[in-house]
């Protein structure tokens, strides 16, 4: 009976983490919709709605702390709880990057200039795929999926480098657009950092499954 209650609590934690991922994916998609359409109302909504994701992280951490104090889990169960706490922190930071993208959109404002967004959108899409895979790998305890997350991170790193070079070159060609392009450089960096956090989530899954630090690269 005690074990059944514990497993139900663990499932609730896992479901809350899944909800966090759904909210974060939605936030990132909306942030890029705002960027592509220059819609400040959507950008502001992303910023305001971030409180929902923050609240979910707090709920996960409070419940995990309560479980550890009450049940005193050891070994695999303890690793599972600690991994979820660490992953929820990573998800919250990714949501913060969606907020940062929205703030950059507001700084860019309405512009008639054609900004190079295609590669940034591709980076966003890869990052979202990584986040979904990271969650699935944890839920299904699938280390192969966790490895796929790390492989995708290499694609993000390559796009980050290519975008940086292209945007710096664009500033030199179009100095009148420097302020807008600098904001795109920030967005490029936010996406690269988001992918790094998702890679850390995959490594947390590997630790949970293997019981030791496990190199996925």
Q: Would you name each region that the model predicts?
A:
Residues 1-217:
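Cytosolic, long alpha-helical scaffolding segments
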């Amino acid at each position: 009976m005690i074990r059944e209650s514990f497993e139900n609590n663990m499932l609730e934690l896992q479901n809350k983490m899944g909800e966090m991922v759904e909210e974060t994916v939605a936030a990132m998609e909306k942030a890029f919709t705002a960027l592509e359409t220059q819609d400040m109302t959507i950008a502001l909504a992303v910023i305001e709605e971030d409180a929902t994701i923050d609240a979910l992280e707090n709920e996960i951490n409070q419940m995990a702390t309560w479980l550890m104090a009450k049940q005193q889990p050891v070994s695999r169960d303890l690793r599972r709880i600690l991994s979820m706490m660490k992953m929820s922190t990573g998800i919250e930071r990714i949501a913060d990057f969606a907020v940062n993208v929205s703030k950059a959109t507001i700084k860019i404002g309405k512009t008639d200039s054609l900004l190079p967004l295609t590669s940034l959108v591709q980076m966003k899409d890869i990052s979202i795929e990584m986040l979904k895979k990271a969650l699935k790998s944890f839920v299904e305890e699938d280390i192969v999926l966790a490895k796929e997350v790390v492989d995708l991170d290499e694609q993000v790193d390559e796009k980050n480098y290519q975008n940086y070079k292209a945007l710096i070159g664009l500033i030199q060609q179009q100095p009148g657009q420097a302020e807008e392009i600098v904001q795109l450089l920030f967005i490029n960096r936010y996406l690269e950092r988001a992918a790094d956090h998702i890679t850390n989530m995959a490594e947390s899954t590997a630790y949970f499954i293997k019981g030791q630090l496990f190199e996925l690269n």
